[in-house]
């Protein structure tokens, strides 16, 4: 079914600079300058995704929009002034390191506000019925950012900022946030850990980032108990494991919660080519996962689904995964063929691995009363 799908994008988000790094290591001492590329969180994966959308003919069939930056009032609903002032000071003084794995350059504060503003505008357009669903190509990402601490390439909590603005201005009630970035959505979890009006679900590689974290036992605190679900998957997990986790835990949890809006923190770093993880997803995995959640949104909240870009660091492959997601969101199939699809499908884990992972997923589903 063809939908009116929004794509929120601004060239200036590509101008956020992460400085001179070799993947994630600052150049200096024993770390040599890279022969090519640079920091993993470069603009190229996002730019190339948009490029492929353009040449495929998909972009003109979408509602292409930009947005105003998130306001100081928007930011203050999540972040204290002391943090925002420190962030802006470093940005104004040419950049530096704001937190763990959080390098920034000149002007990064204003660009981060724009990144959050794109997410806010996408949420508002869907809630107001201007669009059926939407995608925000936000950069820098946001799902690792704590209220007073940046980390993991994230400086502002894009999705919580958008959610809280919609609650304040549009009366939004219950929201479900699904994070399928391969790294745990620790920032979003922290912000909503004590709340029962926001369901947070993170699917991630066990122990990847933050290093050593799995999170099965972190299920919320106080009023929020039971409203935070972590699904750690073993390194090497592929299409079967991720889609089974959605089918067995995520979709039933959504049905039980009955949200008014579903947001996906959409990272592509669980793809088989990513340098910062060890998973085995391909473009059709992301296509099918998007379709699964969109179908749930159709049943539960009038189809209201917003996706906000997070990670994904394989410049050659993220564009194919991102295009597959946009095709699934919009209901428009292009002529583009994924040149690595068959190759990655042949690399999928053997049945014994998939069965072992399914058993772990079943146990977790039982603990949450979903089986």
How should these model regions be labeled?
Residues 62-99:
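Cationic, histidine-enriched alpha-helical/coil surfaces that engage anionic ligands
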């Amino acid at each position: 079914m063809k939908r009116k799908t929004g794509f929120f994008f601004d060239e200036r988000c590509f101008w956020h600079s992460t400085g001179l790094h070799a993947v994630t290591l600052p150049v200096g001492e024993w770390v040599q300058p890279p022969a090519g590329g640079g920091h993993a969180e470069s603009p190229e994966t996002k730019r190339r995704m948009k490029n492929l959308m353009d040449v495929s003919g998909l972009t003109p069939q979408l509602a292409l929009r930009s947005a105003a930056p998130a306001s100081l009032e928007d930011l203050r609903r999540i972040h204290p002034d002391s943090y925002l002032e420190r962030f802006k000071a470093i940005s104004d003084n040419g950049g530096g390191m704001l937190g763990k794995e959080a390098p920034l350059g000149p002007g990064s504060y204003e660009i981060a506000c724009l990144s959050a503003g794109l997410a806010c505008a996408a949420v508002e357009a869907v809630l107001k019925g201007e669009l059926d669903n939407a995608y925000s190509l936000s950069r820098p990402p946001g799902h690792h950012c704590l209220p007073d601490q940046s980390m993991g390439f994230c400086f502002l909590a894009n999705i919580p900022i958008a959610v809280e603005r919609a609650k304040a201005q549009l009366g939004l009630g219950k929201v479900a946030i699904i994070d399928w970035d391969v790294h745990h959505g620790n920032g979003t979890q922290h912000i909503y850990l004590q709340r029962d009006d926001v369901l947070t679900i993170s699917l991630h590689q066990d122990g990847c980032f933050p290093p050593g974290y799995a999170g099965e036992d972190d299920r919320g605190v106080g009023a929020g108990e039971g409203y935070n679900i972590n699904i750690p998957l073993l390194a090497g997990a592929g299409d079967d494991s991720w889609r089974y986790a959605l089918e067995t835990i995520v979709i039933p949890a959504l049905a039980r919660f009955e949200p008014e809006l579903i947001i996906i923190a959409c990272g592509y770093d669980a793809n088989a080519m990513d340098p910062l993880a060890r998973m085995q997803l391909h473009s059709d995995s992301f296509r099918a996962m998007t379709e699964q959640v969109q179908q749930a949104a159709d049943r539960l909240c009038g189809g209201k689904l917003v996706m906000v870009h997070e990670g994904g660091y394989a410049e050659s492959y993220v564009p194919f995964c991102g295009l597959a997601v946009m095709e699934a969101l919009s209901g428009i199939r292009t002529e583009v063929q994924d040149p690595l699809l068959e190759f990655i499908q042949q690399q999928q884990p053997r049945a014994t691995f998939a069965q072992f992972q399914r058993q772990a997923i079943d146990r977790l589903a039982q603990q949450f009363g979903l089986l």
